[in-house]
Regions:
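Flexible "arm" and connector segments at domain edges
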Residues: 1-192
Length: 192
């Protein structure tokens, strides 16, 4: 599945552009960090990280939502995975704090990108930084023994079933909370 193409299709079906989402990006990212901080289950942590990535890719040109991991990173993940056989509640709490710190750094970069009159060279630099965060998130999800691409497919299924409307006052697609047939991502089949 071409995730970038899927997001483009989603935006086109709703007459939403990258540019129209940029003003609300910081608020949307903060919402995902809040969800991450409140998550009590590992799948909720994964869901918040994936939604964070989707918001970035849906608002900023040049974001690679499914980057290829460097072989050295993959090797490092495999080594760490050997040590991380079972995650306790204490481990999850510590892990979440580390991720929250990382995602907040991404929010700082997204704020800079939304500044008026920012030079293209600075946008490129911040976009590269945000792509590094996405690599970190993909690595983290893989380390947690989940297939990142399959998880993203679940997110895409959910996105495509959503009904709602674009609210230009908050620069966000507002989901219809009463929609009975809304698909919720099921990450149980995404385990490695």
């Amino acid at each position: 599945m071409d995730f970038k193409e899927e997001l483009t299709k989603w935006r086109e079906e709703r007459s939403i552009t990258l540019e129209s989402q940029l003003p609300g990006l910081t608020s949307n990212l903060l919402e995902e960090v809040t969800e991450l901080s409140r998550a009590t289950e590992l799948v909720d942590v994964i869901d918040a990280m994936l939604d964070y990535n989707v918001f970035l890719a849906n608002a900023i040109e040049g974001i690679d939502i499914d980057p290829v991991l460097d072989p050295e990173i993959v090797k490092e993940i495999e080594e760490k995975h050997k040590k991380l056989s079972v995650m306790t509640n204490e481990d999850l709490a510590l892990y979440k704090k580390s991720l929250i710190s990382l995602l907040l750094e991404g929010i700082r970069a997204s704020i800079a990108i939304t500044m008026p009159n920012i030079k293209q060279e600075h946008i490129d630099s911040f976009t590269e930084y945000l792509n590094g965060i996405i690599i970190n998130i993909k690595s983290s999800i893989t380390l947690l023994n989940y297939d990142y691409a399959k998880c993203l497919e679940e997110v895409m299924k959910a996105i495509h079933t959503r009904k709602g409307y674009w609210d230009s006052t908050i620069s966000k697609f507002v989901k219809d909370k009463t929609q009975p047939d809304r698909y919720e991502p099921d990450y149980t089949n995404c385990k490695l």
